[in-house]
Amino acid sequence: MATNFSDIVKQGYVKMKSRKLGIYRRCWLVFRKSSSKGPQRLEKYPDEKSVCLRGCPKVTEISNVKCVTRLPKETKRQAVAIIFTDDSARTFTCDSELEAEEWYKTLSVECLGSRLNDISLGEPDLLAPGVQCEQTDRFNVFLLPCPNLDVYGECKLQITHENIYLWDIHNPRVKLVSWPLCSLRRYGRDAARFTFEAGRMCDAGEGLYTFQTQEGEQIYQRVHSATLAIAEQHKRVLLEMEKNVRLLNKGTEHYSYPCTPTTMLPRSAYWHHITGSQNIAEASSYAAQGPEQQVASQFLWAWSDTGRICASTVLLASLAVGVLSRGDIWLTPQVKIWF
């Protein structure tokens, strides 16, 4: 994990071709890789000082690249062209042939994956297609420091059908930490962050984990879809176990237990239900908060059903064998399960 991560891959003076007039104008060109601050892109500045002054550059997002090529010398000397899938192009010239070749190789590697893991251009790489495919499912995030982890900084976040993984930004094969989706208590996002609260089931321990990212909405939708799929799977298991309990208890009234289907509350309703007792205390404390804290308090959350359904499955398993663990599960008119 990189705490001093720099997204600048290459930079230098070039002459960029204007899209409107077709005139080559000298500028300072910065090529940035994708990170928590934004996607892979070219930034054009008037000069090198403008970068230090954090001026507003003209940005070209480098996505959907068809090819990177060198223009023939008779057409334009020391020129490099980026061709996009919509047949548009960005062309620039360099001060020397060596500089043009360096730009060409760098753009080929970063935009097309022509070289992975220090494999030279032109040599076949049997692992490259799989690695590239896996990379497309990872999001650029910056993990903020938290008490439970001794790592933080720029990294890659991956969401599978069962887990959330963090991968090292420099070595994509090094896994840093993981969280089972069924251990998430809640999760949410805003314009610049994705946050989730994990329970005690995960190796990293319970706590709140916050990531700075420009892809918060996409991450949220992936997590939301995966947790819904887990919830549906557990619900099917739950219904099957209820059916088996009825068959086992059929005709044995002495050992039968009331086993009504568990009510599946919507996420929003369930979140309101468990926080209803805290509304009075939170309302008084909210008024005393500053503007930034109030914005954080309005952060969009979604409650994860998976842990609740897992607990319901455990309850039915206990009913099936006629054993209940005192202190963990209480059978009352309104069943309460803590996890």
Curated annotation (Swiss-Prot):
UniProt keyword annotation of Ubl conjugation present: no
Subunit-structure text: Interacts with RET and TEK/TIE2. Interaction with RET is mediated through the PTB domain and requires phosphorylation of RET.
GO BP term, example: cell surface receptor protein tyrosine kinase signaling pathway
Key words of the record: Phosphoprotein
Similarity annotation: Belongs to the DOK family. Type B subfamily.
UniProt free text on domains: PTB domain mediates receptor interaction.
Species of origin: Pongo abelii (Sumatran orangutan)
Function: DOK proteins are enzymatically inert adaptor or scaffolding proteins. They provide a docking platform for the assembly of multimolecular signaling complexes. DOK4 functions in RET-mediated neurite outgrowth and plays a positive role in activation of the MAP kinase pathway. Putative link with downstream effectors of RET in neuronal differentiation. May be involved in the regulation of the immune response induced by T-cells.
Processing and modification events after translation: Phosphorylated on tyrosine residues in response to insulin, IGF1 or RET stimulation.
GO annotation, cellular component aspect: cytoplasm
Domain PH: 7-112
Domain IRS-type PTB: 132-237
Name listed for the protein in its UniProt record: Docking protein 4
Keyword Phosphoprotein (UniProt): yes
Residues spanned by motif DKFBH motif: 265-275
